Amino acid sequence: MPRSQINGNFIDKTFSIVANILLRIIPTTSGEREAFTYYRDGMSAQSEGNYAEALQNYYEAMRLEIDPYDRSYILYNIGLIHTSNGEHTKALEYYFRALERNPFLPQAFNNMAVICHYRGEQAIRQGDSEIAEAWFDQAAEYWKQAISLTPGNYIEAHNWLKITGRFG
């Protein structure tokens, strides 16, 4: 039984009902429907902190999904899980892969910037200011891309760019 049919969360149930209606209305193949079911179940597991289950569902959705745009969101969510688990190198890889398929994911650019900024702070704590500056410069580039896609969002990043002289 798909996870979405047993989940007690009101929002998840509502999303599942709406998604099922849309899947009936919009012409889709059985493979696309199955991929979406795995994706939806992955999101449900992820929202509950069941990352291993979420990853299994996302990997299965990736196996079935052929649309690059839809795959970008699956890859992005896999990146989120790796970020949550502190696996920043893996997370960056999945965010890059998501952006290869959909370059209009400001949240992926933002998350990549956050990881780079974090690594810059780690380098400072280790006494390596040169490496820190390189990480901060990379964070700035990613934040600029996120901001250019969604002006008015990422206010803290925008302020950091101004304060550090990296906006421009």
Curated annotation (Swiss-Prot):
Pfam families the record matches = TPR_1
Q: Where in the cell is it found?
A: Plastid, Chloroplast thylakoid membrane
Q: What keywords would UniProt list here?
A: Chloroplast, Membrane, Photosynthesis, Plastid, Repeat, Thylakoid, TPR repeat
Q: Where are the TPR repeats?
A: 35-68, 72-105, 120-153
List, alphabetically, the SMART domains matched: TPR
According to the UniProt record, one GO cellular component term is: chloroplast thylakoid membrane
Q: What is this protein called?
A: Photosystem I assembly protein Ycf3
Say which species the protein is native to. Answer: Coffea arabica
